[in-house]
């Protein structure tokens, strides 16, 4: 059902989102870099030796302290079909001794036990609704593209914000006489449009994120053509523009996300031929580090939107050499330190534009030209709970 400025959202068809995991050589490199144990009998190898290997659908193992009073555990990413030891327990609990792990089904695992196929890696994505971009101020025209989006929680409500623009041939020829942008904000709790703003000075608005610490929305402006805005635009949560951020090393900002006090931006430097780079910024939008990630994008793929959680950055990539989106879209996954973790395939038949992660909920929006479709999914993961016995 199309959601307009007056109609409510409605759950409709289901769509399957498949993830095809690709890991570094022997899956040792990533885990070693995160402090995880190397495979038994093998030494840890340098990151420079990494070569992506296709094993099938990947899944995440999450470790829950289950009452622990100390210690921190990293997530693991494993492809189906690969046997690999669980990370050494680093949780502690006062007055108790660690007795292994258990999953929600009651299966029990020893410390460092070699496991395989704890999850099939496949997640189902359901289509929530189609949200209208409305009309340009000049209603004789139509929006030609919906781009970046973000789903966020505020004051007990869940919202969707997304951008729209008239990027027609005149726009690409440098004629802005009728070019128009829009940002729309829908309340997913009620299905109602609650705010919209037209003609903010951004180019495309490729990607968006929300910072819950200050309540602001950020737009990666895009910079598709010389002279067009190419940095980061900052808005209040209700779409009032308040600032714009530029960076000497960042010529074109394609994607942005925020998680746990850090922003992550996919972009390129100011010079032609600069590599696709993952930039990490602190909470004050100051550059902390950057990582050349171009070699991890399949040939011909371009950056779309991104999302992040406690451990990983998830980057949508699309191949625009043809529009068979079901075959030409990927999610490239990196650690927060820029190390390659894997590549998943998207089984969505429309152009996937942006991605948001809220806890276990994953949201993906697509470009429907005059609207955007919102899908909801869950990352393929299994949670292992620490088991404790009273200390003797």
Regions found by a protein language model. Give the residues of each.
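Repeated scaffold domains used in trafficking and secretory/extracellular systems
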Residues: 142-152, 202-209, 247-260, 298-307, ...
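Blade-loop segments of beta-propeller domains
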Residues: 181-184, 190-214, 221
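A short beta-strand motif characteristic of beta-propeller blades
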Residues: 126-141, 192-198, 240-247, 287-297, ...
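Structural motif
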Residues: 170-183, 225-234, 272-281, 322-332, ...
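Secondary-structure capping and domain/repeat boundary segments
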Residues: 41-116, 120
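Short coil/turn segments that connect the beta-strands within blades of beta-propeller domains
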Residues: 156-159, 213-215, 260-262, 310-312, ...
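Loop/turn-rich, solvent-exposed surfaces of beta-rich toroidal or solenoidal domains
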Residues: 297-334
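Beta-strand-rich domains and repeat architectures in extracellular enzymes and scaffolds
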Residues: 136-174
